UniProtKB/Swiss-Prot annotation:
MF annotations from Gene Ontology: aldose reductase (NADPH) activity
Subcellular location: Cytoplasm; Nucleus
Positions bound to substrate: H117
Keyword set, alphabetical order: Cytoplasm, Nucleus, Oxidoreductase
Marked site (Lowers pKa of active site Tyr) residue numbers: K84
Protein name: Uncharacterized oxidoreductase C8E4.04
Enzyme Commission no: 1.-.-.-
Residues annotated as catalytic: Y59 (proton donor)
InterPro entries in alphabetical order: AKR, Aldo/ket_reductase_CS, NADP_OxRdtase_dom, NADP_OxRdtase_dom_sf
Gene Ontology BP terms: cellular detoxification of aldehyde
Family note: Belongs to the aldo/keto reductase family.
Amino acid sequence: MSIKEFAKNAREAYFTLPNGDKIPSIGLGTWRSGKDETKNAVCAALKAGYRHIDTAHIYGNEKEIGEGIRESGVPRTDIWVTSKLWCNAHRAGLVPLALEKTLQDLNLEYIDAYLIHWPFALLSGPEELPRNEKGELIYEDVPIEETWQAMEELLETGKVRYIGISNFNNEYLDRVLKIAKVKPTIHQMELHPYLPQTEYLEKHKKLQIHVSAYSPLANQNDAYNSDISKLIEHKTLVDIANARGEGITPANIAISWAVKRGTSVLPKSVNESRIVSNFLYIPLTDKEMEAINNIGVVRRFSHGKFAPKPMFVGLQDGTPKQTHA
C-alpha cells in the first residue's frame, strides 16, 4: 500500500461507541502546545484530514483551538472535540461553570466529550494550582462521586454529548461505576509500547468504555525528561518502519499499533509536516504487533506527581516519577 492509501485509512478509521456513534481513531493532542502555535496546528491538522481534537482547560489554549477550528473551514459537525474538567472545579456547583468557560473559550455551542482530567480535587476557586504559604498545593476533599453526578447532569443541557474520565486508577474507576447512572463513555490514559497496560485495557473493553491514548509516542515529549532512549528510536519500531518502505516513520508504527489495539490515539505536534506525516494508519500484521508487544521496556512517564497520593499504584509501572497535567 502507498502513503496515499495509508492516509485514506486514517481518514476512514473510526471506533464505534456502544450507542452506534463513532469517534475518529487518530486525533491531535495539544498538551504543551503554545498559544502562538496552537491555532495553526489545529487548522493544519483539520485540513490534513484529522477530525478529532483533544484539549483541556489547564492547557490554556482553548481559545486558539477554537480559532483553528473556524479557520480550517471544516464543518463543526464533522469534528470531534474533547476537553477536560480541571481539578479546581470538582464541586458539583462548579462543574457546569467550568464547562461554560471551556465553551466560551472554544467559541463552540457544544463539545463532543468532557472528561474529568484527574480524579482528585484541588481547592475550589480561580487558582488552577492553589498553594499555601509554603508553596505546597492545597487539596480539597471532594468525593469523586459528587463530581461524576454533576458530570451526568451536563448531558441534559445538550452542551456535551459524552462524558468520561482521564488518569483514573482501578479504585476511582470502580467508585464511579458503582454510583453511575451513565457510565463513562471514554477513559483517556497514557498508553504506548513502553506502557501497553494490556490488562487494564481489557477491563475497559469488557466494560464497553472506549480508551483514548495520550502520549502515544511515549517519551517524545521533552517535558517527561526521560532517562531512557526515545520510543521512536527503538530498533523494533525503526525496523518495521524501514521494512514498510519510504515515508513510513517509527511514529506511524507506534500510532498504528495503538489503533490496531482498539484505542483512539492523540499524537501531539505543532509542526505541520509532522502533523501530516503522523496521520497515517498502517494495518500492522500479527507478526509486527507481536514484535512491538515484546519490546520488553515498561515505563510510565505521566505519574501525576502533583497528586495528593500516588495515582497509579496497582497499574503497570505505578511508581511516581514525572508529572503530566
